Each structure stands twice: as C-alpha cells, then as structure tokens.
Amino acid sequence: METLNYKVLEGTGYNGYILKDAPVKVMQFGEGNFLRAFVDYFYDIANEKAGYNGKVKLVQPIGNFPQMADWINEQEGLYTLYLRGSEKGQKVDAKRVISCVSDCVCPYIDGKWDEVLALARSANLETIVSNTTEAGIAYTQGDSQFDQVPPNSFPAKLTRVLFERYKAFNGAADKGLTILSCELIDNNGKELKKCCNNYAKDWNLEPAFIDWMNNANTFCSTLVDRIVPGRIRDPQELAALEEANGYHDAVLDVGEVFGVWVIEGPAELEDKLPFKKAGVNVMVVPDVTPYKKRKVRILNGAHTGFVLGAYLAGFDIVRDCMHNDTIRGFMNKMLHEEIIPTLPLDKKDLEEFASAVEDRFNNPFVNHELMSISLNSTSKWKARNMPSFLAYIDEQKQLPKCLTMSLAAYIAFYSSDIQERTADGLICKRPAGNTYKIQDDAWALDFYYAHKDDTAAQLVHAVLTNTQMWDQDLTKIEGLEAAVLADLEKIRTEGAEAAYKSCL
C-alpha cells in the first residue's frame, strides 16, 4: 500500500480541506502525538475557517528518534487525525487529514540546525509553540553553549533562535514572537522565560538583546486539555482503516473529541492569533490559574471523588460507571452542588465544563481503568478534592454529603480486607473477592498496614488526625469524624453503591 502524501491523497478522492502551499508562520518544538492532535489541529482549522494561510514547521527538541522526522517528511507533513469520543451523549468518530504541517527537522543531523536558524530570520514567522515534556523547561548552568549545534536544552535552543531573529531584524520591536508553552508544569511560560534569561546571561549576550527578548516577545503560560491516546492499538482495526483510506499512514494520530487551550496573555493577543476567528475552543485570558483550578477540581476531582467507591462496588472502567444511575448521579451531585459553587469562574462556563466531563468519561473508545486512576490517591484527594471540601464547609457552614462520602470511600478502599504489604504496594481484597494492589507513597501504605486491625472508629480517627496526610487535623471540623465513620460503616455493611445512593 502506498504511503500518504499529497499525490496519493488526491488519488484516493479525499474531499476534505487541504492546504498544500503556504508560508511557515509557526515553529513548533515537539513533534509528538499530543501537539499534532491538539495545537496543529487548531491551526489546521484556522487555515480552513479563518483564512490563516500558515504552515507549522516541527522541530524535534531531542535527537533520539530522527526516524519520526523521516516519516513525517516522507508524507510531506500530512497525517490522519481521528477525534473519538462522546459529545452530548452521542458517539463521535471524526477523521481529518491535517495539512498545516510543512515538514519536520531533527536539528541534531548535519545542516538541520541551520534550517531552524533560517526560519528564525523569516519575516513570516509569528509564533513558537513547545511541548518538550515536564523536564523540558529546565536550566542547568554550563549545559549548553551559544555556538553548539544545537544547544542541549530546549530553553537554550529557544534563546539562540531569538538571538538569531534579533540580529536579523536589528532588534526591531515589531519582530518579536508569541511563545506558547504547552508543557505540563505550573506557569510554563514564565518558567521558560526565566530559563532563557539565565542562558542569555551565561552567554554574556548584549543587554539590548535581553531587553528585546523580554519586551518585544510575549511568553505565554498556557493550559492544555485533551486526552491523546496517540495511536490505534488494534492491528486489525488499523489495517481496516488503512484499507478504507487507501494509504498507509506512519504517523496517524488519535485524540478525544474534547479539547480546550487556555492561553494567558494580553487581550490584543486574541486578535493576533487566528483561533477566535476560526471558532475553535481556544481562549486568551489574563490569568490561567482559575482555569487550572477548574480542571483540577472538576475533571480530576470527579475522578478521585467517585472511582474508589465505584471499584469497591464492582466496577472496573470509567465508562461503565457512567452507565450506572447511582454512580453517575453521585458524581454529578458532587460536581454541581458541592464543587462548582466553590469555584471563582462564570457558573455557566463551569456547568458546561462539568457536562463535558460526563461525555469524556463516557468515551466509547477509551477503557480507562479505575485502578490506574487510583494511583497515589492520598495526595490526589488532598490536591483535587480537599480544597472544594474545605471551601464548601467555609461557605455553607455544613458538611458536603458527597465529598464526605468520597473521603470515607478513600478510607474504605485503602483498608478493604488488607492481605499484605509488598515491596511496591498494599494488597487488599474487594467485596467481590479478588485482590487488588494499592500503589501510593510508602509512608501512606505503611500507615494503613499498621492500622489493619483497627476498628472502624479507630481507623477514621487515625486517618483524620494524620497531619502528614492533610497538613491539618480534620477532626477539628465539627461533625466530620462522626459523619465519615457512619459513611465508612455504611460502605462496609451495605456496599459502596448503596452508600453512594444514600447521598442522592
């Protein structure tokens, strides 16, 4: 079977949107599945819907997989993207051939770093995008030199690219770039800017350049939200798709339908970027923090809030939980009545985000295992659920029923017929009879193993007073110890599903 390129695609009779030739306006550090299913998808829609007329040049931030660049280039930048999931309760399986990518370069191959620097000198270049993993935004003194081909770290590469542009345009203020950092760390844009400043100082670059770098360029922190499985794992399904498409695609990509990109920047950036006009789910806001809080407390908080009890009730994957009226009802009540009222964003926006969560959890293409979500639940409950729990008590002057029950479910999950403490986990037995392995910090597992013979009352007291877990003594919250004990006993005697139902 022929490999995808423009000629092969034309021969298949594909009638979707395609843009073959356009100037390169975006330099993207990162060629992986996530950026291609997320950022490049948005740029592709912008070409179609907003007349952006721009291509994205991919730059591999590390040199350990140059074959990926070869695959992308053999396909002339084209690749097939499937967005799969559930939207408003309906199954979605949408295919689009993405044509916004010009090519991909591995700067560690002879001559290719020069290609990157040449793009830095281009008047057409407007934006730099990056996703170089959480470890990518880092500064280590002396690890990268100005004249290295290329410098080792990503921030060092970026500093060198910006200096090349500064020189090419004699420090013109209107030739600065918008830099959109997608790495999964807090304040990613601000951290990247700090690293670039450190390299500029290490390399003794002229003060006028440092001034231009900081003031003519806009370093944006961004929040990304789309689950990207990245590939189709079933070889038979993949073969059937290639047969239907009429070509082989070495870099085919798969993402969920839901996707939102929140960019922290000045208001005028919204008109500078092509996304608003394209009508895609990208927003420019003065502060990304409330949106991060929204994601952590609603999306992640929902997961941690219901999955532990759901597992004890006999469920194994998230989608099946969404098909159960009790579990789904418990999650929705927790979200809409206990979590959303404590968040500092527009209520309509929060309600829509929460509704999308149910669709995302109901994705017919993803078997998201409850046990994989259960990893490190002690720190997860503290980070994702406790802030909503405490804020609700502070505002409503009463205990939130569902969040209190979820705390009891956490204790029940960690103490269900404990069998043994192994080197890498705590082996428990669920009511259905099978054993399961809890994975968490060693001190948390040691705590539950040490308390395995406690009465329910002793265990609840020990958990709530454990300041290593919660940074405070939760028994000081009026009525909480008695409520958690009652909920734990209900889970143990009537089952977790019945306990969840009692909250509705």
Task: Describe every region a protein language model picked out.
Residues 1-504:
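Substrate/ligand-engaging "lid" and interaction regions
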